[in-house]
């Protein structure tokens, strides 16, 4: 083994170790904070403990989301912050509806308000914690919006489309994981409230959140993807005009389409990613049946 290879392997190993240690530290700190805030409340059932663990786990997911997309965020916010921040603000408002709606229609959802069940310390902690999560999710959605604007403003190039494809895939997957984790936490919140015997938090709420998050993902993802397909088609047609190409060019055309992600496999992966919140909600409801 050469010294360069050993150094590369050693560096990768240290990065992996530091990443695991960082994730563990974030989880431990959040778990201790949530546990401390929950002292003396009616949130002490096993279901509530699982819910508190999921809350801490979400913090790790959010930190990972920022780390994975940090380079793109810095680049975009320096060069063209308007579309990203504008879209992110709209997504924050949209996601905030999941926090506001239960309070507006509290009589239909709760016998007692959540803060009365959780206590002020835990309730306030969860409120601000979730708000941070909304901002992280919104920034990732803003990166997708920037990709959409970039496709509209610039003439398609191979390098540009490959970069856009990677961003769309990474951001969509990241946003899906964030929303599915939120669905899981909501499901265990519902079970915690039932265990406390203090409210009527219907399981249908979990399903409605899954449906809402799926619709939001589609609204964020579809316009950018449609423009990506349009730009990729334009580039392929410009390089291999349909009326002129022979068998060899047809194979090259197909290879280029595959490289750009215009395949059935990519379409299936995108469908799974965008539908993951509703799939997660259905699974949570099914697993939660007595």
Residue map of PLM features:
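Internal, hydrophobic cores of structured domains that mediate oligomerization or house catalytic pockets
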Residues: 62-179
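Hydrophobic alpha-helical transmembrane segments and immediately flanking/interface helices
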Residues: 113-125, 190-210, 273-290
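A contiguous, surface-oriented mixed alpha/beta subdomain in the mid-to-C-terminal portion of proteins
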Residues: 165-233
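Membrane-helix interface motif
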Residues: 29-42, 97-116, 145-152, 181-197, ...
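An N-terminal, globular interaction/scaffold subdomain
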Residues: 5-105
């Amino acid at each position: 083994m050469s010294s360069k290879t050993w150094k590369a392997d050693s560096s990768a190993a240290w990065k992996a170790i530091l990443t695991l240690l960082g994730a563990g530290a974030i989880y431990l700190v959040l778990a201790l904070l949530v546990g401390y805030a929950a002292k003396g409340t009616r949130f002490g059932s096993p279901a509530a403990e699982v819910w508190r663990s999921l809350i801490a786990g979400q913090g790790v997911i959010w930190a990972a989301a920022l780390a994975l997309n940090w380079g793109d965020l810095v680049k975009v916010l320096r060069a063209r912050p308007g579309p990203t921040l504008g879209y992110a603000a709209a997504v924050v408002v949209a996601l905030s509806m999941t926090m506001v709606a239960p309070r507006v229609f509290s009589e239909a959802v709760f016998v007692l308000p959540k803060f009365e069940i959780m206590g002020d310390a835990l309730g306030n902690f969860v409120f601000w914690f979730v708000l941070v999560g909304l901002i992280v999710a919104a920034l990732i959605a803003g990166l997708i919006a920037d990709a959409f604007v970039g496709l509209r403003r610039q003439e398609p190039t191979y390098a540009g489309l490959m970069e856009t494809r990677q961003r769309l895939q990474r951001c969509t997957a990241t946003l899906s994981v964030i929303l599915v984790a939120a669905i899981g936490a909501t499901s265990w919140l519902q079970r915690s409230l039932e265990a406390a015997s203090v409210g009527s938090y219907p399981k249908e709420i979990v399903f409605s959140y899954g449906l809402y998050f799926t619709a939001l993902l589609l609204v964020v993802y579809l316009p950018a993807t449609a423009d990506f397909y349009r730009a990729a088609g334009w580039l392929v047609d410009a390089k291999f005009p349909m009326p002129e190409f022979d068998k060899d060019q047809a194979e090259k055309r197909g290879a280029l389409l595959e490289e750009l992600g215009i395949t059935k496999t990519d379409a299936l992966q995108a469908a799974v990613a965008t539908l993951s919140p509703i799939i997660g909600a259905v699974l949570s409801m099914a697993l939660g049946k007595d």
